[in-house]
């Protein structure tokens, strides 16, 4: 699955993202750097309109994995380790059209 394929799937399922109060979602990691392999996971950075509980966070992650048919590593800006945060925030490609 290419970066563009991932973007299309996310845009197509924007109602699901809104249900989980997703303000914006972006792709980072190997999908963006062009180093994605067949067994690579999809790294997604999500910013919520308001805080959601752990149950909903895990459920969202599961639904994203089902949608994308691959393992998803879901993260929030606040959860990123300080030493790697600047790199990820420079690299992330936020999905337009949500």
Model-derived regions, located:
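Catalytic core of pol beta-like nucleotidyltransferases
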Residues: 1-24, 32-38, 50-98
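Conserved histidines in hydrophobic membrane contexts and catalytic metal-binding motifs
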Residues: 27
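Acidic Asp/Glu-based divalent-cation binding sites
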Residues: 41-43
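Short hydrophobic/aromatic beta-strand micro-patches
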Residues: 45-47
